[in-house]
Amino acid sequence: DADADADDSIVASDLAEERQSEIYDPVKFEELALPEPLLNAITELGFEECTPIQGRALPFSLSDYDVTGQAQTGTGKTAAFLITLFTRFWENPLQQRPNLGTPRALVLAPTRELALQIEGDAQGLNRFMDVRTVCVVGGMDFDRQRADLLQGPVDILVATPGRLIDFLDRRDINLGAVECLVIDEA
């Protein structure tokens, strides 16, 4: 039902920078229902308040709504979707780990540089949790990425489209258990 799908989707968009301070009432991370280990990592990274895009998106994404976000580079969009993924995995642990190469979340990024940055941000948030992130991108050693992918269960797979196709063609990745899809810079 198209109407039901529309009810489960939210659009979070930042306004012009000069207007943000006039209308945005900052949300503190501690006000959100985040797992304590994740909140500790956010605090250690030096963050107390959500950016405007995070403050608008997180209340919905943490409540299991689909969210489309648009904001300038460097405004915290990556942290918003990673915080959502980490929280989801904490609140919904798997009873049985999936087969190797079967991620719970897929994050598609258009470039190697962005994919590697997303992986680095995920590692920063993962200080006190056990969320396994693997990054597969073109222009880097395929066999090394394959070994990393098949080393153990994957929670978050960050990939560029071309390299994802390479792994799908070889049947090293199974997207059948993906719970969350993030398309960054769509």
What are these regions (language model features)?
Residues 2-4, 15-186:
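SF2 DExD/H RNA helicase N-terminal ATP-binding lobe
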Residues 8-10:
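Eukaryotic nuclear low-complexity, Arg/Ser/Gly/Pro-rich intrinsically disordered regions
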